[in-house]
Amino acid sequence: FGAMIVDTDGFSAMTPKGEKAKKYEDDGYKNRNINLKLGYNFDEQNRVSTSYELIDTKTDIDGYDPITFANDPNNNDIARTKNHLANLTYENRNSIALTKVYTNFTEIKRSSTNSQTPDYKGITKEYGANTSIDYLSSSNVTIGADYKKFENKKDTVDDYDNKAVFVSNTNKFFDDKTIFTQALRYDKYSDFDNKTTGKVGIKQYIIDDLNLSANYGTGYNVPTIYQLYFKDNWGNSGNKDLNPEKTKSYDVGIEYKGFSITYFNTKVKNMIDWETNPLTWAGTYKNLEGTSKLKGTEIAYKNEVVEDTFLNLSYTNLSAKNDKDEYLARRAKNKFNFGVDYYGLKDFHFNINGEYIGTRYERDDKKGAKTGNYTIWNAVVDYD
């Protein structure tokens, strides 16, 4: 059993340009998380387990004037999200394989005190099974299948389902210094084209603390129920004509004693994005034309710096452009994350972490309002 509460005063989400956020009403955030896990071993080979998690969030939001559509930094509206996640799993382990049969249930509810924003309820049901088999001295293959049904339960009932089969394989060679991974997946959708995707990767240890890695993969991201069917009283709506995103990506990296540098490159065809009409201010999701390109470098360091104290730093430089070679909206070129964890006091965990978001723009091609250029600090104390 576990429980966690995050409560922060925050700052105004719509501070006028050139003004200081402290002059306006704070937009706070509260997150309550409760989780429960139970398991029973029938014998050494058979086990059943279940889990339940509740995530309840409350966010102060700043809305718009219903007549002029001007930002209202002192708006007192509240948005709430309540997620229920449940799982039931049966496991059988024998000398050949580990087999799992499972079901997952997810319910997402969204509500708001703003009369123009209707409630939303979405449900995902999943049933699946997989078998993992060790072979040779240090290789493993996993074969499985699953079924998912996605439902919109508010106002109108809309749904689609997904059936999939998949296989993944890992091989280790030369005293486990070479790790080769492969994965293949076939998805059959009720409302979208069927698709086969895959991934291959390799990691090579030069010495114990130094390794090189490379990965290549394809992806197929279908629109969510929310992106397809949501609507509000402001004129914003989902788009039932959205097409899935098709991605091709690769990355190469080097790591030494907790320090790593990774270059990544992703191409996304039919990227799903949000578009606002500049005249009516009503918006909807759409597929961007052509192929969008996201590439960049991540530099990270994670290690124990003194006894019981761990430092975590990362910097990401991102170039995100659409098919017209224009910078994509709402994506910061520079981002920096930092954190310090201390475990030296029995049963306690102390953490300080933060994130810096660099310059970004509200619309493509560096147009619209300039946002970003802010830092958020967090402090966490856990007792176990």
Show where each model-derived region lies.
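Periplasmic-side early beta-strands and strand-to-turn transitions of outer-membrane beta-barrels
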Residues: F1-A79, T359
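Conserved C-terminal beta-signal and adjacent last beta-strands/turns
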Residues: G2, G39-N41, T131, K203, ...
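Membrane-embedded beta-barrel scaffold of Gram-negative outer-membrane proteins
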Residues: M4, T8-D9, R93-S112, Y205-S213, ...
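Membrane-embedded beta-strands of outer-membrane beta-barrel proteins
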Residues: L36, A86-L88, Y127-A129, V165-V167, ...
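Face-selective signature of the C-terminal outer-membrane beta-barrel domain
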Residues: G39-T57, D77-Y205, F259-T262, F310-N312
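Surface-exposed extracellular loop regions of Gram-negative outer-membrane beta-barrel proteins
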Residues: D56-K58, D65-F69, T156-V157, S190-D251, ...
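Gram-negative outer-membrane beta-barrel transporters
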Residues: S137-T142, K172-F174, F180, K267, ...
